[in-house]
Design a protein with these regions (language model features):
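Non-catalytic, mostly N-terminal accessory regions of nucleic-acid modification and defense proteins
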Residues: 1-193, 264-275, 364-368, 390-405, ...
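Short acidic (Asp/Glu) and glycine-rich catalytic loops that position anionic groups and cofactors
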Residues: 11, 137, 231, 261-265, ...
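Conserved Class I SAM-dependent methyltransferase catalytic core
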Residues: 28, 32, 243-250, 265, ...
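Conserved nucleotide-binding/hydrolysis micro-motifs of P-loop NTPases
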Residues: 42, 204, 245-246, 272, ...
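Hydrophobic alpha-helical scaffolding
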Residues: 148, 201, 240-244, 283, ...
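Conserved S-adenosyl-L-methionine
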Residues: 171-286, 291-295, 302, 310, ...
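DNA target-recognition domains and sequence-specific DNA-contacting regions of bacterial/archaeal
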Residues: 281-287, 293, 321, 463, ...
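C-terminal, active-site-flanking charged/polar segments
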Residues: 358-359, 371-421
Length: 501
């Protein structure tokens, strides 16, 4: 988490953009992202050069010699952050605008890397030399502070903090699934080193980043020290799709700042015929758009066969089933209406999950989880694609607290069910004897089917009413008489004190 002096410096950097005339938070994030990458490029090049020297291996810097930019050849060292950050403001500005930006836009000539795809149409928007000079100085101070912290997570935390400002500013708040909820879902799914992971509505790539961090932290030896697994992790494991190009660029950069070199983040309308993915992924993690409505003619025909509806939350569930391999797993967030909606489409998608696949868990979340951006009640569905059923019983959990207050302030609290949810889900064999009055319990498939495939926890949860015992009428009347006598005695004492008798 970003706190103290580092947080203050990032806020100052944001303020520099804001007061300088860049008032669209998406533009600010984009420009910061580009500048972070330009600085990182210099740092990474220096690290690689030192490593090569220590090992006695040859190394050619990407800044070595003369570099062709347009119709001119430039001394490559001038493109290094460590060189141009000492230039006078006007020279630094012209260097950045005329040389550095064109250089990084064409850095990967293969056009297939995530970097080249999202930098290809990058535009330098810092309006004045003086503003750029202040930004570069502030960024140097931020990086110096990050080095003092000496934590592998700091880079990612800084970027997450920047992304949180999108939501704070009221822009694209719908893309912000709370980080602790994302992490809980990833922990429950426990990704493996050979997964192919997808988020078909990825936004800023929060789920993909969390999955990559989980693998780095929990399975580092297996993922990063095995050549084949590392190549898969860096280039083939993570797939994300979205319809907002700016969010795609930010999402791709988010992945790269968290150490994934070449994520497959692409512009795509996941629900349309444009998306032909079928039985491709082993794990889907998603929080698809709620309450959207689409025309039938732009929705993929095979999704409408599963449930004929215009509701995006139902269509995305049908899509997840189609995109998963047999044996593939999904953890996704849905609005409560998906669980109990009475329309034909609602029932059809729930039936498909229960009867044609293996629905494993329904975690009901309190309505304040998405505050202050939305007060909608939601749940997490976890299922495995089988294509032939397999649901025996479904595990339900009633989350009452997520570690934060459920009002608009969302301040940290001690009440937190998340560790308990993860622990219980990982030990489902110990859950079989729980009663319907407990916070979690199993419900047999037959009972769910009898109830129209209703998946709302309140349909099955039993509330234990503890009878309240009241004193007898005689006891109450006796107590009232005693109170009355005491009042009379005290009134008499007061009158004597005041000399009224």
């Amino acid at each position: 988490m970003v706190t103290g002096e580092l947080k203050s410096k990032i806020d100052n950097l944001w303020e520099l953009f804001w007061t300088g005339g860049l008032t669209n938070p998406l533009d600010v994030i984009e420009q910061m992202t580009y500048l972070m990458f330009i600085r990182d490029l210099d740092d990474a090049d220096n690290v690689h050069a030192k490593e090569a020297a220590m090992l006695g291996l040859p190394y050619k810097s990407i800044f070595a010699g003369e570099i062709q930019i347009g119709d001119r050849k430039i001394d490559g060292s001038q493109l290094k952050w460590s060189t141009f950050h000492d230039f006078p403001a006007a020279k630094m500005y012209s260097t950045m605008q005329e040389w550095v930006f064109p250089f990084i836009k064409n850095l990967h000539g293969d056009k297939e890397s995530a970097y080249s795809k999202y930098m290809g149409d990058a535009i330098f928007k810092v309006p004045t030399p003086l503003m750029l000079d202040k930004i570069v100085t502030t960024m140097d101070a931020i990086y110096e502070q990050m080095e003092q912290i000496k934590s592998a997570d700091t880079r990612g935390d800084v970027y997450e903090y920047l992304l949180s400002k999108l939501a704070t500013a009221g822009v694209n708040g719908q893309f912000r699934t709370p980080r602790h909820i994302i992490r809980m879902m990833v922990e429950m799914m426990d990704p493996k080193a050979d997964e192919i992971i997808c988020d078909p509505a990825c936004g800023t790539s929060g789920f993909l980043v969390a999955a990559s961090e989980y693998l780095r932290d929990r399975k580092k030896q297996e993922v990063l020290f095995d050549r084949q697994n590392k190549e898969h992790y860096m280039n083939h494991m993570f797939h994300g799709y979205d319809m907002d190009r700016t969010m795609l660029r930010i999402g791709a950069m988010n992945m790269m700042t968290h150490g994934v070199e070449n994520p497959y983040i692409e512009y795509r309308d996941s629900l349309s015929d444009q998306n032909t993915d079928k039985e491709k992924y082993s794990l889907i993690l998603a929080n698809p758009p709620f309450k959207g409505s689409l025309d039938y003619d732009i929705v993929s025909a095979d999704l409408l066969k599963v449930c004929k509806t215009k509701k995006t939350e139902l269509l995305f569930l049908a899509l997840f089933i189609r995109m998963l391999k047999i044996g593939g797993r999904c953890a996704c967030i849905v609005p409560d209406g998906v669980l109990f909606g009475s329309s034909t489409a609602h029932k059809a998608i729930r039936k498909a999950l229960v009867e044609e696949n293996r629905l494993e868990a329904v975690i009901s979340m309190p309505s304040g989880v998405f505050k202050p951006y939305a007060g909608v009640s939601t749940a997490i569905l976890i299922f495995t694609k089988t294509g032939h059923g397999g649901t025996d019983k479904v595990w339900f959990y009633d989350m009452k607290a997520d570690g934060f207050s459920l009002d608009d302030k969302r301040t940290e609290t001690k009440e937190n069910d998340i560790p308990d949810i993860i622990e219980r889900f990982r030990n489902l064999d110990k859950e079989t004897d729980r009663k319907r009055t407990d916070q979690s319990f199993f419900v047999p498939k037959e009972e769910i089917a009898e109830n129209g495939y209703d998946l709302s926890i309140n349909k099955y949860k039993e509330i234990e009413y503890v009878p309240v015992e009241y004193p007898s009428t005689q006891e109450i009347m006796t107590e009232l008489h005693e109170i009355e006598m005491k009042i009379g005695e005290e009134m008499q004492a007061l009158e004597e004190l005041l000399g009224l008798n």
